[in-house]
């Protein structure tokens, strides 16, 4: 769809596989799409909502699979490499956009203009108390405007 065709819709962007050793989001996203479209008539079950999904953001790292990558992680036996083929950690490239992967993602982001971006990092097999965890930036390090926004949406 063209961007103008999406005006008036709630737009969600799902990004998986930013670190190839944390690839569960790719599998979960593909399963989600399967379940959302595997209904009678294959109709999208959420009218007024558009979804863009990047299943493997770090393709170089995903394809560089080895049992010697991330040896301190609790499984799986083989996993991809954390960085790109140029050894960039894409998680640290959002501002500078040095990598072609990040420039492509930011192009999609700017064109799609999502209301919500879900970056599906995963743990290394640790057993956490909660099914879903999230992280907010350290309050005292934020710009005053961001502090106000964070307090309004997440803390009040």
Task: Enumerate the language-model features and the residues they cover.
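Conserved beta-strand/loop block within the catalytic cores
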Residues: 1-2
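Active-site/substrate-binding loop(s) of hydrolase catalytic cores
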Residues: 6-18, 22-155
């Amino acid at each position: 769809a063209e961007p103008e065709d999406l005006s008036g819709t709630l737009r969600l962007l799902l990004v998986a596989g930013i670190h190839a050793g944390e690839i569960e989001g790719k599998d979960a996203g593909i399963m989600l799409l399967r379940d959302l479209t595997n209904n009678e008539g294959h109709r999208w079950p959420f009218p007024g909502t558009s979804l863009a999904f990047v299943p493997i953001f770090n393709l170089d790292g995903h394809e560089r699979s080895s049992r010697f990558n991330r040896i301190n992680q609790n499984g799986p036996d083989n996993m991809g490499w954390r960085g790109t083929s140029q050894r960039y950690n894409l998680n640290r490239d959002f501002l500078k956009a040095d990598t072609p992967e990040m420039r492509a993602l930011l192009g999609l982001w700017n064109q799609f203009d999502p209301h919500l971006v879900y970056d599906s990092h995963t743990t290394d097999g640790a057993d956490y108390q909660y099914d879903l965890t999230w992280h907010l930036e350290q309050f005292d390090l934020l710009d005053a405007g961001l502090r106000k926004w964070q307090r309004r949406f997440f803390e009040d």
